[in-house]
Design a protein with these regions (language model features):
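N-terminal cationic leader/targeting segments used for protein routing and processing
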Residues: 8-10
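Cationic, low-complexity basic patches in intrinsically disordered or flexible, solvent-exposed regions
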Residues: 3
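Alpha/propeptide regions of enzymes that mature by internal proteolysis
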Residues: 12-189
């Protein structure tokens, strides 16, 4: 693998992180946000739940695109898939209609179904009209194959992990110092 210009990798050093922190200069016409993170966009909240134990290294990330009810206040969106094999859920409708109507969940490849079920239940609880006076909901779940790092066959991501990530995002949002405190409170509840 070729190294990023201006950065020499030493033995055991990990160059993952933000591209510019690794010496990679990306040229574009837009200015980066203050922290160069998704949470620089006003209203976006993000939280994750990590599951680790021996060979288990996986988790769930929840992205709330705004503070309101996403099903009732849909957002214009698009998708571009790179190196994808069609295992994410909700992308086809997103491309067809050009909007998202749920929070976005990211998890491992074999946990997409579990995450979609949890996200659908979350949306049904918030919107009693889904499937009654409106259409159904399009849960948006993306994935990454973490099988090299994780016992992916163990199907360790459960509905409660998705629920916890959503709750953490709602309660802490972009305040990552507060995120750890909220996570501890939820675990002890």
């Amino acid at each position: 693998m070729e190294q990023a210009p201006g950065k020499v990798k030493s033995e055991g050093e990990n160059l993952m992180g933000l591209p510019r922190d690794c010496g990679l200069e990306l040229h574009h016409k837009w200015k980066s946000g203050k922290l160069n993170k998704i949470t620089d966009v006003n209203g976006i909240k993000v939280a994750n739940v990590t599951i680790q134990d021996n060979e288990i290294n996986t988790g769930v990330t929840a992205i709330l695109p705004h503070e309101g009810n996403v099903f009732k206040s849909k957002l214009v969106a698009g998708a571009s898939v790179l190196n994808g094999f069609g295992k994410s859920l909700g992308i086809v409708q997103l491309k067809e209609l050009g909007n998202i109507e749920t929070p976005i969940i990211m998890t491992n490849t074999l946990s997409v179904g579990e995450a979609a079920t949890a996200l659908t239940k979350y949306c049904l609880e918030q919107n009693e009209d889904i499937g009654v006076t409106t259409g159904t909901v399009n849960p948006l779940v993306t994935e990454c194959n973490d099988g090299m790092l994780n016992d992916i066959r163990g199907l360790h991501v459960k509905e409660e992990h998705v629920r916890e990530a959503l709750k953490l995002a709602e309660e802490s949002g972009t305040d990552f110092d507060k995120l750890a405190q909220v996570a501890e409170t939820i675990k002890n509840a």
